[in-house]
Design a protein with these regions (language model features):
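Generic helix N-cap/helix-start motif at coil->alpha-helix transitions
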Residues: 40, 55-56, 88-93, 123-126
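Canonical tetratricopeptide repeat
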Residues: 15, 19, 60-61, 96, ...
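Terminal, low-structured helical/coil segments at or just beyond the last alpha-helical repeat
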Residues: 91, 108, 125, 131-166
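Alpha-helical solenoid scaffolds in eukaryotic macromolecular assemblies
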Residues: 62-66, 95-100
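Structural marker of alpha-solenoid helical repeat scaffolds
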Residues: 6-7, 50-51, 85-87, 119-121, ...
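Amphipathic alpha-helical repeat scaffolds of TPR domains
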Residues: 7-27, 52-67
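Structural signature of tandem alpha-helical TPR/SEL1-like repeats
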Residues: 1, 32-43, 68-82, 103-116, ...
Length: 166
């Protein structure tokens, strides 16, 4: 991140910011997650000063609000939603809106967005497994099984495959 700030090119800022955003989803420590979200937000913001028309950067910056950036999460959702309305087939926008719905407990909206992702990109294994998880959380075992079955063909980890079989 520091190297990207020094270089101050759109490419390096976006690479560092997207890398941090990707890692954020797996961070359980609230302090670290908030710090990383703020760092990613700062990188996205700097990149947007260089190119305010980069949809991926706008979506990424909006997504950082889901992970603890100071401010209202709705601000991030509105930025992402604007891109999704302009381009309904933008997988990144649809995915992050689904993720935002999941984080905020709006599982029906999250399912709707992840279904859209799988329509556009049928091999998006992350959306497939998140759908399975959301259906399972909601008590819809039938749909959970359907999506877990769809996802199994993308699993290469034998331990995970065994867990899915159970």
């Amino acid at each position: 991140a520091e190297k990207a700030k020094l270089e101050n090119s759109e490419k390096s800022l976006n690479f560092a910011a997207h890398s941090m955003l990707e890692e954020l989803r797996g961070v359980s420590d609230p302090g670290l997650r908030t710090w990383m979200a703020n760092e990613a937000n700062n990188l996205f913001t700097r990149s947007l000063t260089l190119n305010p028309n980069n949809d991926s950067t706008v979506i990424g910056q909006g997504s950082t609000f889901f992970f603890g950036v100071s401010g209202a999460p709705m601000e991030g959702i509105l930025k992402i939603r604007a891109i999704a309305e302009k381009d309904p087939n933008n997988v990144f926008a649809q995915f992050m809106l689904g993720f935002g719905g999941m984080v905020s407990g709006q599982n029906d909206k999250a399912i709707e967005r992840f279904l859209k992702v799988t329509e556009i990109d049928p091999q998006n294994s992350e959306a497939i497994f998140l759908l399975a998880e959301l259906y399972e959380r909601g008590g819809d075992k039938k749909n959970a099984l359907v999506w877990y079955e769809k996802g199994k063909k993308y699993v290469e980890n034998p331990e995970l495959m065994k867990a899915l079989e159970e």
